[in-house]
């Protein structure tokens, strides 16, 4: 029985310039901010932006809605 998690080979690295080749953001390009080799996903600057609702805290008592990049699958991006 094997233990541990298998990492997938991801063809891009942090700070590479990539272009999205499929999905809602097809044709957009940006810099890779982070790579998740275990899940085979990457976060690309300015791509797959979603709204995230943040709870109220002492620093922001009303809470807030922030927009941030979410991961896309590595097979949906190409270098260049």
Curated annotation (Swiss-Prot):
Gene3D superfamilies: 2.30.30.30. It holds the Pfam family KOW. It comes from the Bacteria. One of its GO terms (cellular component) is ribosome. InterPro entries: KOW, Rib_uL2_dom2, Ribosomal_uL24, Ribosomal_uL24_CS, Ribosomal_uL24_KOW, Translation_prot_SH3-like_sf. Disulfide bonds: none annotated. One of its GO terms (biological process) is translation. GO terms for molecular function: rRNA binding; structural constituent of ribosome. Keywords: Ribonucleoprotein, Ribosomal protein, RNA-binding, rRNA-binding. The keyword GTP-binding does not apply. HAMAP family: Ribosomal_uL24_B. Belongs to the universal ribosomal protein uL24 family. One of two assembly initiator proteins, it binds directly to the 5'-end of the 23S rRNA, where it nucleates assembly of the 50S subunit. One of the proteins that surrounds the polypeptide exit tunnel on the outside of the subunit. Part of the 50S ribosomal subunit. This is Large ribosomal subunit protein uL24.
